[in-house]
A protein has these predicted regions:
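Outer-membrane beta-barrel porins/channels
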Residues: 2-247
Protein backbone atom coordinates (compact mmCIF):
# COMPACT_ATOMS: atom_id res chain seq x y z
CA UNK A 1 0.00 0.00 0.00
CA UNK A 2 1.38 3.41 -0.95
CA UNK A 3 0.19 7.01 -0.82
CA UNK A 4 1.15 9.69 -3.35
CA UNK A 5 0.38 13.41 -3.55
CA UNK A 6 -0.21 14.01 -7.27
CA UNK A 7 -0.94 17.73 -7.32
CA UNK A 8 -1.09 20.71 -4.99
CA UNK A 9 -3.44 23.49 -6.08
CA UNK A 10 -2.60 26.01 -3.34
CA UNK A 11 -1.83 29.37 -4.93
CA UNK A 12 -2.73 33.05 -4.82
CA UNK A 13 -2.30 35.60 -7.58
CA UNK A 14 -3.88 38.74 -8.96
CA UNK A 15 -3.24 42.28 -10.06
CA UNK A 16 -3.63 45.81 -8.77
CA UNK A 17 -3.51 49.04 -10.73
CA UNK A 18 -3.08 52.56 -9.40
CA UNK A 19 -3.98 54.10 -12.77
CA UNK A 20 -7.45 54.33 -14.30
CA UNK A 21 -8.41 51.47 -16.58
CA UNK A 22 -9.39 51.89 -20.22
CA UNK A 23 -12.86 50.45 -19.62
CA UNK A 24 -15.11 48.93 -16.99
CA UNK A 25 -16.62 45.50 -16.54
CA UNK A 26 -19.95 47.33 -16.85
CA UNK A 27 -19.18 47.62 -20.58
CA UNK A 28 -19.17 43.83 -20.79
CA UNK A 29 -22.49 43.58 -18.95
CA UNK A 30 -24.07 46.07 -21.37
CA UNK A 31 -22.88 44.08 -24.39
CA UNK A 32 -23.99 40.78 -22.89
CA UNK A 33 -27.44 42.14 -22.05
CA UNK A 34 -28.13 43.59 -25.50
CA UNK A 35 -31.18 41.94 -27.05
CA UNK A 36 -32.24 40.15 -23.85
CA UNK A 37 -35.79 41.08 -22.73
CA UNK A 38 -36.02 42.58 -19.26
CA UNK A 39 -38.23 39.75 -18.04
CA UNK A 40 -35.36 37.31 -18.75
CA UNK A 41 -32.32 39.35 -17.72
CA UNK A 42 -32.17 38.22 -14.07
CA UNK A 43 -31.36 34.66 -15.17
CA UNK A 44 -28.37 35.79 -17.26
CA UNK A 45 -25.62 34.87 -14.79
CA UNK A 46 -23.28 37.72 -13.85
CA UNK A 47 -25.09 40.12 -16.15
CA UNK A 48 -28.27 39.34 -14.24
CA UNK A 49 -26.51 40.34 -11.03
CA UNK A 50 -25.43 43.62 -12.67
CA UNK A 51 -29.10 44.28 -13.47
CA UNK A 52 -30.21 43.50 -9.93
CA UNK A 53 -27.60 45.88 -8.46
CA UNK A 54 -28.49 48.69 -10.93
CA UNK A 55 -25.11 48.64 -12.70
CA UNK A 56 -27.10 48.30 -15.92
CA UNK A 57 -30.68 49.43 -16.44
CA UNK A 58 -33.24 48.98 -19.22
CA UNK A 59 -33.94 51.78 -21.68
CA UNK A 60 -37.64 52.18 -20.96
CA UNK A 61 -38.54 54.88 -23.54
CA UNK A 62 -37.90 55.19 -27.26
CA UNK A 63 -36.50 58.26 -29.05
CA UNK A 64 -39.97 59.85 -29.10
CA UNK A 65 -40.45 59.36 -25.36
CA UNK A 66 -42.94 56.53 -25.68
CA UNK A 67 -42.71 53.72 -23.10
CA UNK A 68 -41.20 50.44 -24.30
CA UNK A 69 -42.91 47.23 -23.23
CA UNK A 70 -40.39 44.64 -21.96
CA UNK A 71 -37.30 46.52 -23.23
CA UNK A 72 -34.23 44.65 -24.47
CA UNK A 73 -31.64 47.44 -24.58
CA UNK A 74 -29.71 48.72 -21.58
CA UNK A 75 -27.49 51.57 -20.47
CA UNK A 76 -25.73 52.70 -17.29
CA UNK A 77 -25.66 55.96 -15.39
CA UNK A 78 -22.12 55.08 -14.23
CA UNK A 79 -19.61 56.84 -16.48
CA UNK A 80 -15.83 57.20 -16.47
CA UNK A 81 -13.08 54.65 -15.99
CA UNK A 82 -12.32 52.94 -12.68
CA UNK A 83 -9.33 51.68 -10.75
CA UNK A 84 -9.33 47.89 -11.00
CA UNK A 85 -7.92 44.97 -9.03
CA UNK A 86 -8.41 41.22 -8.90
CA UNK A 87 -7.36 38.47 -6.51
CA UNK A 88 -7.61 34.70 -7.05
CA UNK A 89 -7.13 32.20 -4.23
CA UNK A 90 -6.94 28.49 -4.99
CA UNK A 91 -6.72 25.62 -2.53
CA UNK A 92 -6.84 21.86 -2.72
CA UNK A 93 -4.96 18.79 -3.80
CA UNK A 94 -5.14 15.51 -5.69
CA UNK A 95 -3.76 12.32 -4.16
CA UNK A 96 -3.76 8.59 -4.77
CA UNK A 97 -3.65 5.52 -2.56
CA UNK A 98 -2.42 2.42 -4.39
CA UNK A 99 -2.92 -1.22 -3.45
CA UNK A 100 -0.33 -3.26 -5.34
CA UNK A 101 0.97 -6.81 -5.64
CA UNK A 102 3.93 -8.40 -7.41
CA UNK A 103 5.04 -11.93 -8.28
CA UNK A 104 8.21 -13.63 -9.56
CA UNK A 105 8.09 -16.76 -11.70
CA UNK A 106 11.43 -18.59 -11.78
CA UNK A 107 13.30 -15.30 -12.14
CA UNK A 108 12.10 -15.20 -15.73
CA UNK A 109 8.79 -13.41 -15.50
CA UNK A 110 8.09 -10.58 -13.07
CA UNK A 111 4.53 -9.29 -12.80
CA UNK A 112 3.19 -6.38 -10.80
CA UNK A 113 -0.17 -4.71 -10.68
CA UNK A 114 -2.18 -2.30 -8.62
CA UNK A 115 -5.43 -0.52 -8.07
CA UNK A 116 -5.29 3.22 -7.45
CA UNK A 117 -7.94 5.18 -5.56
CA UNK A 118 -7.73 8.91 -6.23
CA UNK A 119 -9.26 11.82 -4.35
CA UNK A 120 -9.54 15.38 -5.60
CA UNK A 121 -10.52 18.61 -3.87
CA UNK A 122 -10.31 22.08 -5.42
CA UNK A 123 -11.57 25.48 -4.29
CA UNK A 124 -11.25 28.75 -6.19
CA UNK A 125 -12.36 32.17 -4.95
CA UNK A 126 -12.07 35.07 -7.41
CA UNK A 127 -12.59 38.67 -6.31
CA UNK A 128 -12.75 41.51 -8.81
CA UNK A 129 -13.15 45.13 -7.70
CA UNK A 130 -13.61 48.50 -9.36
CA UNK A 131 -13.40 51.92 -7.72
CA UNK A 132 -14.84 55.04 -9.35
CA UNK A 133 -14.01 58.70 -8.75
CA UNK A 134 -16.71 61.40 -8.76
CA UNK A 135 -19.43 58.99 -9.89
CA UNK A 136 -22.78 57.87 -8.44
CA UNK A 137 -21.08 54.50 -7.89
CA UNK A 138 -18.22 54.38 -5.40
CA UNK A 139 -17.13 50.73 -5.67
CA UNK A 140 -18.34 47.47 -7.15
CA UNK A 141 -17.12 43.98 -6.35
CA UNK A 142 -17.70 40.53 -7.78
CA UNK A 143 -16.91 37.32 -5.91
CA UNK A 144 -17.05 33.93 -7.65
CA UNK A 145 -16.66 30.71 -5.67
CA UNK A 146 -16.06 27.31 -7.28
CA UNK A 147 -15.72 24.04 -5.37
CA UNK A 148 -14.93 20.67 -6.97
CA UNK A 149 -14.41 17.36 -5.21
CA UNK A 150 -14.60 13.72 -6.15
CA UNK A 151 -12.94 10.34 -6.33
CA UNK A 152 -11.49 8.19 -9.08
CA UNK A 153 -10.13 4.72 -9.73
CA UNK A 154 -7.47 3.33 -12.06
CA UNK A 155 -5.57 0.12 -12.74
CA UNK A 156 -1.94 -0.48 -13.64
CA UNK A 157 0.00 -3.54 -14.76
CA UNK A 158 3.68 -4.14 -15.38
CA UNK A 159 5.51 -7.15 -16.83
CA UNK A 160 9.21 -7.93 -17.26
CA UNK A 161 10.33 -11.00 -19.18
CA UNK A 162 13.94 -12.27 -19.20
CA UNK A 163 14.29 -14.76 -22.07
CA UNK A 164 18.04 -14.86 -21.40
CA UNK A 165 20.17 -13.31 -18.69
CA UNK A 166 21.31 -10.27 -20.68
CA UNK A 167 17.94 -9.34 -22.19
CA UNK A 168 14.97 -7.71 -20.44
CA UNK A 169 11.66 -7.15 -22.23
CA UNK A 170 9.11 -4.96 -20.53
CA UNK A 171 5.47 -4.00 -20.88
CA UNK A 172 3.34 -1.60 -18.83
CA UNK A 173 -0.29 -0.60 -18.92
CA UNK A 174 -1.93 2.35 -17.18
CA UNK A 175 -5.69 2.43 -17.43
CA UNK A 176 -7.66 5.66 -17.63
CA UNK A 177 -8.64 7.18 -14.32
CA UNK A 178 -12.40 7.23 -14.04
CA UNK A 179 -13.55 10.16 -11.90
CA UNK A 180 -16.93 10.93 -10.37
CA UNK A 181 -16.95 14.66 -9.60
CA UNK A 182 -19.27 17.11 -7.89
CA UNK A 183 -19.13 20.85 -8.59
CA UNK A 184 -20.68 23.83 -6.81
CA UNK A 185 -20.62 27.43 -8.04
CA UNK A 186 -22.08 30.71 -6.86
CA UNK A 187 -21.38 34.40 -7.38
CA UNK A 188 -22.13 37.55 -5.40
CA UNK A 189 -22.07 41.15 -6.62
CA UNK A 190 -22.01 44.23 -4.39
CA UNK A 191 -22.38 47.83 -5.59
CA UNK A 192 -21.83 50.72 -3.18
CA UNK A 193 -23.53 53.92 -4.36
CA UNK A 194 -23.11 57.41 -2.96
CA UNK A 195 -26.78 57.69 -1.90
CA UNK A 196 -27.66 58.20 -5.55
CA UNK A 197 -31.28 58.97 -6.39
CA UNK A 198 -32.29 56.87 -9.38
CA UNK A 199 -35.30 58.68 -10.77
CA UNK A 200 -36.35 55.91 -13.16
CA UNK A 201 -37.04 53.57 -10.23
CA UNK A 202 -37.75 56.31 -7.66
CA UNK A 203 -35.16 54.85 -5.30
CA UNK A 204 -32.10 56.12 -3.45
CA UNK A 205 -29.25 53.67 -3.95
CA UNK A 206 -26.80 52.77 -1.20
CA UNK A 207 -25.35 49.30 -0.77
CA UNK A 208 -26.94 46.97 -3.30
CA UNK A 209 -26.13 43.26 -3.40
CA UNK A 210 -27.27 40.23 -5.36
CA UNK A 211 -26.41 36.54 -5.21
CA UNK A 212 -26.83 33.80 -7.78
CA UNK A 213 -28.42 30.50 -6.96
CA UNK A 214 -26.04 27.76 -5.84
CA UNK A 215 -25.38 25.74 -9.00
CA UNK A 216 -24.64 22.07 -8.30
CA UNK A 217 -23.63 19.60 -10.98
CA UNK A 218 -22.35 16.02 -10.98
CA UNK A 219 -20.38 14.59 -13.86
CA UNK A 220 -17.79 11.97 -14.81
CA UNK A 221 -14.32 12.44 -16.25
CA UNK A 222 -11.96 9.95 -17.86
CA UNK A 223 -8.25 10.60 -18.37
CA UNK A 224 -6.28 9.01 -21.26
CA UNK A 225 -4.96 5.45 -21.15
CA UNK A 226 -1.21 4.82 -21.41
CA UNK A 227 0.60 1.75 -22.77
CA UNK A 228 4.34 1.31 -22.93
CA UNK A 229 6.96 -1.25 -23.85
CA UNK A 230 10.71 -1.52 -23.85
CA UNK A 231 13.78 -3.69 -24.18
CA UNK A 232 17.16 -3.63 -22.46
CA UNK A 233 20.29 -5.44 -23.66
CA UNK A 234 23.15 -5.79 -21.17
CA UNK A 235 26.65 -5.72 -22.66
CA UNK A 236 28.53 -7.14 -19.73
CA UNK A 237 30.95 -4.63 -18.23
CA UNK A 238 30.53 -2.36 -21.26
CA UNK A 239 27.10 -1.11 -20.18
CA UNK A 240 23.68 -1.64 -21.72
CA UNK A 241 21.41 -0.49 -24.52
CA UNK A 242 17.80 0.39 -23.80
CA UNK A 243 14.80 1.44 -25.88
CA UNK A 244 11.32 2.44 -24.70
CA UNK A 245 8.13 3.52 -26.39
CA UNK A 246 4.88 4.91 -24.95
CA UNK A 247 1.53 5.51 -26.57
Amino acid sequence: ISFQRIANFNSEFGFFSDVLGDNSIIDFYLQDAFGVPENQIESLGLTGLAYQTYLINPIVRDAQGNPINNPNSYDSFVLGNPFQDENVQQDGSASQMTFSYGANFNHKIFIGGGVGIRSLSFTSVKRYNEEFIDQPLSTSSLRETLFINGTGINLNLGLIYKPIDYVNLGFNFQSPTWYALSEEYEAEMIANYNNYYFEQEDITLGRQSALTDLFISNYSLRTPMKIGGGATFFLGKNGFVSADVDW
